[in-house]
Design a protein with these regions (language model features):
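Enzyme catalytic cores with a strong preference for nitrogen-chemistry domains
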Residues: 1-302
Length: 302
């Protein structure tokens, strides 16, 4: 079995590096164990701006965390977008930020790309929503015997690949726990993504367990796609992950900081991005079949 896996590894295709850029992720910092429904959302934006002011960087791409900006629909006409557009121009950098866009009793979890001198270029609305986190299944029934005040609005799902365009070209984007699902990263890579961004938020948790799981998932997605992954979390962990899964740089929890590294924009498919789960399923079937056959032969010879 080990020989089969090693042989497959030797012939597996990979991505090819193209341009090298400087990339940064912004971690606003703050306390753990907080709730979005009872928190000051304006303060989250202010902490992102404060982190940038305290840690000036010369960078080509800057990624902000999930729900770094909260505004009312349409976000395209919001004051907050104007602030970020001006910032992108002043810094001469592409900003990938994440908006919580309130629309009545609903909201959208949207990542946007902002080019300097241009403003909003593209948006991606989160597709894979969190049940009981971003929406309540059977809300009409459950609200009869449960307090749903912390999830007062229902998230509206997006559609399409996890991808946003920018002057740097196509950028993959998976929001929060979408990084746990290979098909969301694959959708962006198949549409041309040369780098993966992952705005996320784990400030509602009181310990490091979920941030560690998120970072581990980002490392897996980096290896599968052979792409750099930029994970920006409001309170950590934020990280820049190399295509081989190595963590180039990582923040501490609750820290206000900006992480910066040289990264490659890469093209090409791996088996994971080209075929999805099929190769793993075939290998698993071969290993199980081989094990069953070996067991049968041992019983016959006994």
């Amino acid at each position: 079995a080990v020989g089969i896996l090693l042989g497959v590894a030797q012939i597996a295709p990979g991505a090819s590096p193209e341009d090298v850029i400087t990339a940064s992720v912004v971690q606003a910092g703050g306390d753990l164990g907080t709730r979005a429904a009872t928190s000051d959302q304006v303060a989250v934006l202010d902490r992102h701006l404060a982190a940038i002011e305290a840690n000036p960087v010369d960078t080509d791409l800057m990624v902000w965390s999930e729900s770094s900006v909260t505004t009312f629909a349409p976000l395209e006409q919001s004051r907050e977008l104007s602030i970020l557009s001006e910032l992108a121009t002043n810094l001469d950098t592409v900003i990938v930020a994440n908006f919580s866009e309130i629309d009545g009793d609903n909201f959208r979890n949207a990542s946007v790309s902002i080019d300097p001198g241009v403003g909003l270029v593209d948006r991606y609305d989160k597709v894979h929503l969190v049940p009981f986190g971003e929406y309540i299944p059977l809300r009409g029934l459950i609200e009869n015997f449960a307090d749903l005040s912390l999830i007062s609005r229902e998230a509206l799902p997006g559609s399409g690949p996890g991808l946003i365009q920018s002057r740097l070209g196509p950028i993959g984007n998976v929001i929060s726990f979408e990084v746990y699902f290979p098909e969301r990263v694959r959708s962006g890579v198949q549409s041309g993504a040369r780098i993966i961004t992952n705005p996320t938020l784990a400030s509602s948790y009181t310990n490091s367990l979920v941030p560690e799981q998120s970072l581990a998932s980002a490392r897996l997605r980096a290896i599968e796609s052979d792409r750099w992954v930029l994970q920006a979390s409001t309170t950590g962990y934020s990280a820049i992950v190399a295509p081989d899964g190595r963590v180039a740089v990582r923040s501490d929890l609750k820290q206000q900081t900006i992480l910066t590294s040289q990264v490659q924009l890469r093209t090409g498919d791996t088996w994971a991005t080209r075929f999805g789960k099929l190769p793993v399923s075939v290998l698993a079937a071969m290993l199980l079949g081989g094990s069953a056959l070996a067991g049968s032969r041992r019983r016959d010879s006994a």
